[in-house]
Amino acid sequence: INVECAFRCAKAERLQTMTTQNFHAQWAWRGAESAVANVRIGVSNGLITSVEDGVEAQAGDERIAGVVMPGFVNAHSHAFHRALRGRTHGGAGDFWSWRTPMYEIANRLTPETYGELAAMTFAEMALSGITGVGEFHYIHHQQDGTRYVNPNEMGLAMVAASQRAGIRMALLDVAYLHAALD
């Protein structure tokens, strides 16, 4: 599967000065049982404005070999958990022991480090064909527990990270008030 289209379409979306760009896909999956051949996709100001099946490429179309398909959506992400990779799988741990390193990482994040970590996470998603993410957002305070002057400081870092990676994000604001089941 050619995920290049997701990047090219995202590129066209970011280039708001570009009024119209047309792509011609050798094959496109349109939700049916099989892919459709020779699909022309028109993009205007970052939005798909037309899709034509079974047509030949026209002069100026950007040709895409292989199969294109709509971008995937990751509807459940905790971007900062990327920092846990390789740190929680040793021994016979369980969910409760896993929380300790998770809290340690969460308590060390600043808007800058959170943004960098999220940008790397979102870039990996984009490289996998994900074009939208639902990010569970529950880190709102400074390392010492005090509020930021701007209460959305950490959220703004997440928004900037998703824009930097070129994927859309729904910031799912979560109130994490209790860390136990009882």
Language-model segment annotations:
Residues 1-3, 18:
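Short hydrophobic transmembrane-like helices used for membrane targeting/insertion
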Residues 15, 180-182:
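Short, intrinsically disordered, charge-balanced linker/junction segments flanking boundaries
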Residues 16-57, 67:
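N-terminal metal-binding scaffold of metallo-dependent hydrolase/deaminase domains
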Residues 77, 171-173:
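A cross-domain feature marking catalytic cores of carbohydrate-active enzymes
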Residues 86-168:
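Alpha-helical scaffold segments that flank or form the walls of functional sites
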Residues 138, 174-179:
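Active-site beta-loop-alpha junctions enriched in small/polar residues
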